[in-house]
Amino acid sequence: GLHYQPSQIIVSCGGKHSCCNVILATCQEGDEVLIPAPYWLSYPEMVKLCGAVPVPVLPEDGSFYPRMQDITQNVTSYTKAIIINSPSNPTGAMYSEEFIAEIVAFCESKGIWLIMDDIYHRLIFDGRKPFSVYKFAKKSVEETRIIVVNAGSKQYAMTGFRIGWAVDNKKLIRIMANIQGHQTSGPSAITQHLAVGAINGIQSCVESLRQTLENNRKVMMQQLEAFNGVRAFKPDGTFYCFAD
């Protein structure tokens, strides 16, 4: 497995807080941040907080799976970061390892930050296996442009506890700590201990939740497909279902 130093990790008041701190630490007025669409409603608002510009990326083939061509044709000299949430809120689409490998190589070569929101990465279906974006990095955590965000909210059903974290190089983590220090100081010590218990505890609860969600997906798809004129995208993970 991967090993990180404490100085390469920041713990925040939820994954949302971590995402916001990452954007505030990396972007400034006039920068552009690419976000594959449809996307979680908070991403563009976080980008706007620092005066940067959210740039929706719409796959030309009409699917929920962007191709590298969709990404690269939206890149300009102002592009500072790309946000990837896989599997995705709100579609449940999980991007292929090949696509993630391509986007890692692209971001490393162009010096663009790749913000990976892994909040749903263990809640995936049909035999899919979670993987770390760092397996595709050619550089160390200290040198790469990858930032990984996660939380206890979804995988451990700890939404109300507000505990999340981000992994990146020491310099950026220090900047994020400075920002967070003037926002919330830090997350509750109690919830931090509870999160440690969840992470180090028996992980069968995550698999049980995953199986429940996969069964729920089956029921949801059956119900939606029974309606005339309704098309539903079969999600690869999460607890969302995007119907048309």
What is the role of each PLM region?
Residues 196, 211-221, 231-244:
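Conserved glycine-rich beta-strand-loop-beta hairpin in the small C-terminal domain of fold type I
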Residues 61-129, 134:
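Active-site phosphate-binding strand-loop segment of PLP-dependent enzymes
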Residues 1-32, 140:
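Phosphate-binding glycine-rich loop
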Residues 176-180, 198-222:
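Structural signature of PLP-dependent enzymes
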Residues 136-175, 187:
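Active-site PLP attachment segment
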Residues 50, 109-110, 227:
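Helix C-cap/helix->beta junction micro-motif
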